[in-house]
Amino acid sequence: MDQPAAAEIVNLHKTFKTGLGKPVVHAVRGVDMNIRQGEVYGLIGPNGSGKSTLMKALLGLVRPTRGSCSIFGKSSLSPDSREEVGFLPENPYFYKFLTGAETVAFYGKLCGLSGRSLKEKVRELLDLVGLSDAADRRLGGYSKGMLQRIGMAQALVQSPRLVVLDEPTAGVDPLGSRDIRNIIENRKNRGMPVFLCSHLLEQVQEVCDRVGIIFKGLLIAEGSMNELTRDSDKQEILLEHASPCLLEELKKMVREDGRAVWLEDGHPRNSL
């Protein structure tokens, strides 16, 4: 028997009333989506496109106007569906008077951990997010990137089967963004499904197996990054140790073809 999808959304509609005599706002319009076991799924779209509303419906934080959402086969409207989900909201709030270790321990206790298992989990997660050296510092002295990494730690504290991240690099500098990306890749390598909401194309390109593009509440495209960004009218050739003579010969062949056009050449660039 096939395993259920990590998360499934079927014909989701969500409207909001804005006031007496005013038209309703259609935040999400008939979206179908599934997040497979072991994949990183990225939902991308501009601000106000419906990303956060869709994510909140999946987590059972808002009730769908029509349609359904489920997590590991359980309805999102059931509190049980959230027991195995780790969630990092956009701009999470933390108690600034607590240290990093105390913060992770606080969320661990909320999830039922205690004693030695709690201490080991706190130590493990602070090491994972690169904050072992700052474990005893109060959050009031943390940078934005450090706070986001503490947010990642609290999202993982109960060893969830699914992690949901809403704009995990919001307000974070490039180095902090890379740290968070590495944490996501670490979870992916362990087979944990991740649902990532973002408005940053570069972020989803780097870590996501599949991507959905949402605009004005509609899922207008979905697929792998290769499928979504492929230009079928062009061919790309990548050569190594090609001599100038070989390149000139290739350009000559293109000119003689009559239809093909040599657009550009140069050395490929690597990400910093």
Residue ranges and their predicted role:
Residues D2, T18, E227-T229:
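Generic marker of residues within folded, mature protein domains
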Residues P4-A7, K14-F215, L219-A221:
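ABC transporter nucleotide-binding domains
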Residues E8-I9, W262:
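Short stretches within intrinsically disordered, low-complexity N-terminal or propeptide regions
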Residues V10, R36, E240-A242:
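A structural detector for beta-sheet-dominated domains
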Residues R181-S271:
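ABC transporter nucleotide-binding domain
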